Amino acid sequence: MQELYKIDTHIFLRNNGTYSGDLRAPGLFIEDTLMIQIKVNNYSVEVSGHAGYMPHGSDIVCAGVSALYQTLEESAKELTDGTYKTSSEAGYGRICPIGEVSNEYKLLVSSFLIGVNGIAASYPDYVIVHAD
C-alpha cells in the first residue's frame, strides 16, 4: 500500500514507510520535486523537506542543512538569554523566538542564512530559501 506524504507544496509517495532518498529507487514515485524549503520570517526559522540528492544516509545536502539548523537551535539556547519555541522531527525543524529578539539571536540567524544560501547556490534544484 502506498502512503501519501505532503511536505509544504511538494508531494511524494513512498512504499513500506521508508524514504530512500534515491529518486530512481523502486517504489518511490515523484508527484513533484523533492526539495528542502527554508523559510525565515521575523527571525522565525522553519526547515522542511528532504533534498533527495543522494540515498538516505549519504545525502550531503540534507546533512549540511541539518547541521546548520541544529547548530542554530542549540546555539540560540546556549548562547542567548532568549526564550524559544522549537519543534523538530525527521525532515522538519522550527525555532521561533518568544518576546524580544536579541542581537545575539539575530547574528545567529544571519550566520545560518549565509550557510544555507551557500548550499542553495551550490544545489539550487534541492534547496530553496525564502527570507524576508
Residue map of PLM features:
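Short, conserved glycine- and acidic-residue-centered signature motifs
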Residues: 61-65
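Short, Lys/Arg-enriched N-terminal segments with co-localized hydrophobic residues
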Residues: 15-34
